[in-house]
From Swiss-Prot:
Molecular function terms from GO: alpha-amylase activity; metal ion binding
EC number: 3.2.1.1
Chain positions recorded as Ca(2+) binding sites: N121, Q167, D176, H210
Pfam families associated with the record: Alpha-amylase, Alpha-amylase_C
Entry annotation: catalytic residues: D206 (nucleophile), E233 (proton donor)
Signal peptide interval: 1-21
Assembly: Monomer.
GO biological process, any: carbohydrate metabolic process
Protein name per Swiss-Prot or TrEMBL: Alpha-amylase
Site (Transition state stabilizer): D297
Alphabetic keyword roster: Calcium, Carbohydrate metabolism, Glycosidase, Hydrolase, Metal-binding, Signal
């Protein structure tokens, strides 16, 4: 959920509060297995997710799909209603328990693991009837929580320099759970164990910044599978406690600075600066970082690139998937002019690129780089080249090579690689490239295009 930036001026009385999405953490420090890319299908219903696992995510090589919060939530026409739970029943607008279970099973059959965006910092504001028929009022969620289960501070967070205020007061007026309390910890773990019983493979912990790290560690220790993938949304702020590094003991932490700086480099500076992108920039260790070009909050608040940046956005995703730092998320949502607008058709996706669904995970330039990443996993960066400005190229050992041209003119040159001699398919243009016995090839890249070769595709 949103730590600071809201999607709009929202009325508390109507429970109208937007919460920024939190990068989640993984117990494994990065997703386990050889496929570490997650497709974040934001506000897709579970029937649509299941179909996409079979038709696209599995064949493309995605390791994970992240689904939006499944718990019953407040009613309303905004996307952020999903982030205001009123019970832990799987009864949100995206599907019921049967649809959720079927989705998990279908994705597993396609070789794709399932991560759940999990809201455990707070419950809703306001009062009313939830999407699954449960009645609630703020601080009273029958059969689940009552007033003693919430933090004593019932005021909104006002001071991000004050750790206690950040972690014990209310995020945009939402009822803040006392996660230091035994019953609350037990109840949250019960919810997550229920999801594990349905086959989920991991969790993204929304608004983790607002939960003490020791509370999350305690909750995680109660899981039936304590090795579940675990990634946490902890937003770095200069001079602000808590710090992302406090949370790496339980899993991955999403590295917001990576996304912020990527926007600045691609729009104001030079791609040549990316030669040492990652830990040398002061970021978390690659083994504990979750990275992204944008997420559902940042695409709306302007702090990162988003789909409206067109080719610049595409190239940033190509770079992220080619560069060996962190575990990448590919944000895949829908068009919006109103940043609060809920998904088209209640989250049902009949087809990509229709009815406003952007399906970034399926854009050929992005989807093709998932296999590139899988093929080059563990290989170092080699053969770096740049023109001092916005054309760069680099290899991934003997397994792959990428060139990106963010200049306004065509770049034609001979590239030196560490690839074995032979023919390769440029998965960006779907054309064949021949590498000679010295590891060289010549290519012309038009403005705002890329080239990517890997040893998993030797023909087009």
């Amino acid at each position: 959920m949103a730590s600071r930036t809201l999607s709009g001026a929202l009325a508390l009385a109507a429970a109208a509060t937007a919460v920024l999405a939190a990068p989640a953490t993984v117990a494994h420090r990065s997703p386990p297995g050889t496929k570490d890319v997650t497709a974040v299908l934001f506000e897709w219903d579970y029937v649509s997710v299941a179909k996409e696992c079979t038709s696209t995510l599995g064949p493309a090589g995605y390791g994970y799909v992240q689904v939006s919060p499944p718990a019953e939530h407040i009613q309303g026409s905004q996307w952020w209603t999903s982030y205001q739970p009123v019970s832990y029943k799987i009864a949100g607008r995206l599907g019921d328990r049967a649809a959720f279970r079927s989705m998990v099973n279908t994705c597993h059959a396609a070789g794709v693991k399932v991560v759940v965006d999990t809201v455990i910092n707070h419950m809703s504001a306001g009062s009313g009837t939830g999407t699954g028929g449960s009645s609630y009022t703020k601080y009273d969620y029958p059969g689940l929580y009552s007033a003693p289960d919430f933090d004593d501070c019932t005021a909104e967070i006002t001071d991000y320099q004050d750790r206690w205020n950040v972690q014990h007061c209310e995020l945009v007026g939402l009822a803040d759970l006392d996660t230091g309390e035994e019953y609350v910890r037990q109840t949250i773990a019960g919810y997550m164990n229920d999801l594990l019983s349905l086959g989920v493979d991991g969790f993204r912990i929304d608004a983790a910044t607002h939960i003490p790290a020791e509370d999350l560690a305690n909750i995680k220790s109660r899981l039936s599978n304590p090795n579940a993938y675990w990634k946490q949304e902890v937003i770095y702020g200069a001079g602000e406690p808590p710090k992302p590094g406090e949370y790496t003991g339980t899993g991955d932490v999403q590295e917001f600075r990576y996304a912020y700086d990527l926007k600045r480099v691609f729009t104001q500076e030079h791609l040549a600066y990316l030669k040492n992108y990652g830990e040398d920039w002061g970021y978390l260790s690659s083994t504990t970082a979750g990275v992204f070009v944008d997420n559902h909050d940042t695409e709306r608040n302007g702090s990162t690139l988003n789909y409206k940046n067109d080719a610049t956005y595409t190239l940033a995703n190509v770079f992220m998937l080619a560069w060996p730092y962190g575990a990448p998320d590919i944000n895949s949502g829908y068009e919006w002019s109103d940043p609060d607008a809920r998904p088209p058709d209640g989250g049902h996706v009949d087809a990509c690129w229709q009815n406003g669904w952007k399906c970034q995970h399926k854009w050929p330039e992005i989807a093709s780089m998932v296999a590139f990443r899988n093929a080059t996993r563990g290989e170092p960066v080699t053969d770096w080249w740049d023109d001092g400005a916005d054309a760069i190229a680099f290899g991934r050992g003997s397994k792959g090579f990428v060139a990106i041209n963010h200049e306004s003119a065509t770049v034609q040159r001979t590239y030196q690689t560490s690839l074995p001699a032979g023919t390769y398919c440029d998965v960006q243009s779907n054309t064949t490239v021949t590498v000679d016995s010295a590891g060289r090839f010549t290519a012309a890249l038009g403005p705002d295009t890329a080239l990517a070769l890997h040893n998993g595709r030797t023909s087009c």
